[in-house]
Regions:
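Conserved short beta-strand edge segments in small beta-sheet-based binding/regulatory domains
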Residues: 28-31, 56-64
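Short amphipathic alpha-helix segments
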Residues: 7-26
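Acidic, low-complexity, intrinsically disordered interaction modules
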Residues: 21-47
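Surface-exposed beta-strand edges and flanking loops
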Residues: 6-8, 31, 42, 63
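Short amphipathic alpha-helices in soluble, non-transmembrane regions
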Residues: 16-22, 49-58
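Short, intrinsically disordered low-complexity segments
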Residues: 1-2, 23, 61
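Generic signature of intrinsically disordered, low-complexity, basic-rich segments
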Residues: 3, 14, 43-45
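Short glycine-/aliphatic-rich beta-strand segments at the starts of folded cytosolic domains
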Residues: 1-10, 37-38
């Protein structure tokens, strides 16, 4: 299964987690303790919708 890895600042962590839980997306989340970046691993199909939601919320993100 293809996965998307999205990285963003930790201040958006709760908003992104709320979106993932409310839409029943299986995800894995980790936080880099040195930079404060959050990495979210989601299936490719759900990742496209997540990217659209991040754009809607104006969350700056990077694809890894």
């Amino acid at each position: 299964m293809k996965r998307i890895v999205v990285t963003f600042d930790c201040k958006y962590k709760h908003a992104v987690r709320a979106y993932l839980v409310s839409n029943r997306v299986q995800y894995s989340m980790s936080t880099d303790i040195y930079t404060g970046d959050v990495h979210v691993y989601v299936p490719h199909v759900k990742g496209v919708a997540l990217l659209a939601e991040l754009r809607r919320l104006s969350v700056p993100y990077r694809l890894v």
